[in-house]
């Protein structure tokens, strides 16, 4: 491994992420209990009064809250519509996340596209620039078909929840080459005709494979 690659890998390990994993066939209280037992804290409780979404939460040994929330897009009985929402994670937490998913699966959780389930990964913005995000958008646009095939995404999910990079956004992004995050945000919303309510959680620009 050359020095440049080594440095890139070390920098990648500093990246913060948040992960959301949708599943069914397990109720949220049961999932939270499994997590609390895995963490060795035994601490889990109903936090819907604070978090909404019929949430149950579990806490790890670092005091971080892992949430299990209701997501209506998941198939099955309402009591078993379960979305794991992690706290902010780093590379060091990957084995913990993987083992938790294994424990949940052993407890009965199921997750695949036929159940209306997906995975969302939120990347921390720290360290990124308009240029790195433009590079990311272009890389994603050139590999989306491979990702869709590998994940066996059906046409409905691609057209509704996992839309490909909007060609209007990509064209303006590469033509204007924004130098500030504010300019990048303007291109993202205006190119897709979603500048109204851009601070709203359910803005119409969401539900792409890549969301900025």
Which residue stretches match the model-derived regions?
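Active-site beta-strand/loop microenvironment that shapes enzyme catalytic pockets
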Residues: 121-123
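C-terminal accessory/tail domains of diverse enzymes
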Residues: 1-113, 126-212
């Amino acid at each position: 491994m050359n020095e440049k690659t080594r440095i890139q890998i070390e920098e990648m390990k500093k990246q913060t992420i948040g992960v959301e994993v949708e599943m069914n066939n397990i109720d949220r209280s049961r999932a939270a209990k499994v997590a609390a037992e895995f963490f060795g804290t035994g601490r889990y409780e109903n936090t819907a009064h604070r978090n909404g979404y019929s949430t149950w939460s579990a806490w790890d040994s670092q005091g971080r809250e892992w949430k299990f929330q209701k997501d209506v897009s998941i198939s099955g009985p309402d009591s078993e519509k379960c979305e794991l929402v992690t706290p902010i994670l780093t590379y060091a937490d990957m084995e913990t996340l993987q083992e938790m998913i294994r424990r949940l699966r052993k407890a009965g959780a199921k997750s695949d596209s036929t159940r209306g389930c997906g995975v969302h990964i939120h990347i921390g913005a720290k360290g990124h620039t308009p240029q790195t995000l433009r590079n990311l958008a272009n890389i994603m646009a050139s590999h989306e078909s491979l990702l869709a095939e590998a994940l066996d995404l059906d046409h409905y999910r691609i057209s509704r929840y996992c839309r490909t990079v909007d060609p209007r956004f990509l064209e303006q992004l590469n033509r204007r080459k924004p130098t500030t995050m504010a300019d990048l945000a303007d291109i993202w919303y205006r190119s897709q005709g979603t500048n109204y309510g851009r601070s709203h959680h359910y803005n119409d620009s969401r539900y792409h494979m890549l969301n900025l």
